[in-house]
A protein has these predicted regions:
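Vicinal oxygen chelate
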Residues: 11-13, 66-104, 112
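Short solvent-exposed loop/turn micro-motifs enriched in small/polar/acidic residues
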Residues: 32-35, 88-90, 109
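Short secondary-structure boundary/capping segments
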Residues: 39-41, 56-58, 86-87
Length: 112
């Protein structure tokens, strides 16, 4: 199995775009047919992250947990305005933050 699409629905689409852009996503505005305008970013050549406006005020899927590998965790935390102290783990430096909708996002900096 290979994941190729993640769709996040939100009532804070611009805040979400800013947050995930700070993590390295490069979004383009899209619209498919009569569907809503949304943002899409291709990650790692074949995984697409899309930000869509919430339908009828539905709550975001706050139970979702995303993991993002970053090059410099301290710089990333500063760029998203988070003051969490990263912890050393067996996988590298790790910090857990929340996106503007409250989803858990785990940041990981692999160390050699």
């Amino acid at each position: 199995m290979k994941l190729n699409l993640i769709v996040l629905r939100t009532t804070r689409i611009e805040e979400m775009r800013t947050f995930y852009s700070a993590l390295g996503a490069r979004f383009e505005k899209e619209r498919h047919g009569n569907g809503p305008e949304h943002y899409a970013a291709t990650l790692d050549d074949d995984l697409v992250l899309e930000l869509y406006p919430s339908v009828d005020g539905a709550m975001p899927d706050s139970g979702l947990r995303l993991g993002v590998r970053v090059d410099n965790i301290e710089e990333t935390l500063r760029s998203i305005g988070q003051s969490v102290a990263p912890r050393q783990t067996q996988w590298g430096l790790r910090a857990v933050v929340r996106d503007p909708d409250g989803r858990t996002v785990e940041l990981l900096q692999i160390q050699s």
